[in-house]
C-alpha cells in the first residue's frame, strides 16, 4: 500500500478492502452467525491460555451446542488455546509459551500498540491483561477473513476494547499517517519470513513507530555466526511461503538498515512438538510431519526451526 494516499483516501481504501474480505461467501455467513450469538456476560483471565468464564452458567449451558458448533466451523484454530466456558479450543500452537517468553520484556502501560499479523487476536488478549487496562489502544492488523471471524467470535464474549483491521503490514505506515498517530510498541510475531521484502518490511515497521518506540520481533533464525541467509528453494518445513531465514548477524544488519537499534536477543528457542502440534481443531498436519524422523532437520533437509525473539528501538 502506498503511503502517499491522503487520510480520506486511505480510509476509503481500508473500508473497501475490509468489505471485500468480509463479503466473501465463506466468511459472510460466519460473521452473521457470530453477530446472532446471545450476549453472555463474562470475564476472562490468562492461565496457559485464555479462559472465558460466564457470569450466568445456566445461560452459557443453554447455548452450548450452538457455540460449540460455530467454534468448529471456524477451524483452523492456529493460535490459542481458548477455554470458552466449558469448550476447550485446543489450538495447534500453545501460544502462551511464546507470550510467557515475551511478557517480562514488554512494558505496555500507557502505550499505543500494534500487533501486525495478529491472527485471531490471542496475543492482544494477553496484552490487554498485561497492560492492566492502562494502555492507550491495542490494534491488530491481519488481512485474513477467517482470523477476523475467530477474533469476533472470542471477543463477542470478552467484549475487549481491541480493534482489528483487515490490513497487512504493507498498510501499516499508511494507516499510521492517515490516523496521524505513530505506535509506541509494535509486535511482529511470525511474519518476517513470509515476506518477499524483509528489509522493506522492517522499514515500514520502523517508520510506523514513534522515536524511541519498540519493536518486538519474532522470526525464524538460521544458526550461523556468518552474515548469511537461508532462501529455501521450494519450501521450508512444508511451508511454501517462507522466503528468507536470516542468521542473527544478518538480521541485525537488516534492522540497522531500517533504523532499528539497541538490538536485544530476548530468547532463542527451537520449536518443539510441545508448542506446535496436531489438534482436532486444525484438521491438518503439524510440526511432527514437517521434520525428519529424528526431528533434527526439516523434511527438506534444512536446519530444524529455531525461533528468535528480539527487542529493538527506533532512533
From Swiss-Prot:
Its EC number is 2.5.1.-. It catalyses: carboxy-S-adenosyl-L-methionine + 5-hydroxyuridine(34) in tRNA = 5-carboxymethoxyuridine(34) in tRNA + S-adenosyl-L-homocysteine + H(+). Catalyzes carboxymethyl transfer from carboxy-S-adenosyl-L-methionine (Cx-SAM) to 5-hydroxyuridine (ho5U) to form 5-carboxymethoxyuridine (cmo5U) at position 34 in tRNAs. InterPro entries: CmoB, Mo5U34_MeTrfas-like, SAM-dependent_MTases_sf. It is an enzyme of class 2 (transferase). The lineage of its organism: Bacteria, Pseudomonadati, Campylobacterota, Epsilonproteobacteria, Campylobacterales. GO terms for biological process: tRNA wobble uridine modification. It comes from Helicobacter hepaticus (strain ATCC 51449 / 3B1). It comes from the Bacteria. This is tRNA U34 carboxymethyltransferase. SUPFAM superfamilies: S-adenosyl-L-methionine-dependent methyltransferases (SSF53335). The keyword Transferase applies. Carboxy-S-adenosyl-L-methionine binds at residues 79, 93, 98, 117, 142-144, 169-170, 193, 307. Homotetramer. Gene3D superfamilies: Vaccinia Virus protein VP39 (3.40.50.150). Belongs to the class I-like SAM-binding methyltransferase superfamily. CmoB family. GO terms for molecular function: transferase activity, transferring alkyl or aryl (other than methyl) groups. It holds the Pfam family Methyltransf_9. Keywords: Transferase, tRNA processing.
